[in-house]
């Protein structure tokens, strides 16, 4: 059985939610749960662990990575310090930097919030060989405009899902997985 490297969102586990859906498609799963010991690491240590996982076990053209929300942010920061990832990457509701929603009066400022855009604008952000991003049009955590802007800067396709929020929904994600995991 082929193994997918999976990075769930904050507080996520490998074998529930999206991880279960990946497994139900007939794949083994490995990666980093964003709970417990891993969540207690500082951001740079989390990024280094992901980069080491990728280099040690998934650095080949047939490797596949799926990352969701903050897991996508971890992947992108790991990718920033590596050559272009040689396999395929699927990023769902990817955090790509800081965001504030005036209408909700809430925001999100992850560690190194501007780094990805700084690297991309300077031409120093390696983009994976094959990558796609999907974000909801109503996602307040992952500004769809910023996701599309980053995608354009690094040559990665970004699909905006009309009416969807941060959770893209099992039907949409199931359809994406059906195609992407073939």
List where the protein language model places each region:
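Short beta-strand/loop motif that positions the catalytic acidic residue
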Residues: 127-128, 132-135, 139, 147
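Active-site catalytic motif of lipid deacylating hydrolases and related acyltransferases
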Residues: 1-60
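Conserved alpha/beta-hydrolase "acid-adjacent" motif
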Residues: 15-16, 140-146, 169
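Short glycine-rich catalytic loops that host catalytic nucleophiles or stabilize transition states
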Residues: 32-36, 159-165
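Catalytic histidine-centered segment of alpha/beta-hydrolase-like enzymes
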Residues: 40-41, 164-175
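Active-site nucleophile loop of the alpha/beta-hydrolase fold
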Residues: 34-37, 90-99
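Gly/Ala-rich beta-loop-alpha elbow adjacent to hydrolase catalytic centers
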Residues: 66-76
């Amino acid at each position: 059985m082929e193994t997918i490297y999976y990075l769930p969102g904050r507080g996520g586990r490998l074998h529930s939610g999206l991880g279960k859906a990946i497994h139900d498609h007939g794949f083994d799963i490995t990666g980093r749960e964003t709970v417990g010991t891993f969540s207690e690491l500082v951001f740079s240590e989390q990024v280094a662990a992901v980069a080491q996982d990728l280099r040690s076990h998934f650095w080949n053209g047939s490797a596949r990575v799926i990352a969701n929300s903050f897991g996508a942010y971890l992947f992108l920061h790991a990718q920033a310090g590596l050559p272009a990832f040689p396999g395929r990457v699927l990023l769902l509701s990817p955090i790509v930097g800081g965001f504030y929603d005036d209408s909700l009066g809430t925001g999100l400022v992850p560690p190194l919030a501007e780094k990805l855009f700084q690297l991309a604008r300077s031409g120093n952000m390696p983009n994976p060989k094959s990558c796609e991003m999907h974000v909801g049009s109503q996602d307040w955590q992952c500004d769809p405009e910023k996701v599309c802007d980053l995608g354009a800067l690094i040559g990665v396709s970004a699909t905006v899902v009309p009416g969807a929020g941060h959770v893209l929904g099992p039907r949409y994600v199931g359809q994406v997985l059906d195609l992407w995991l073939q």
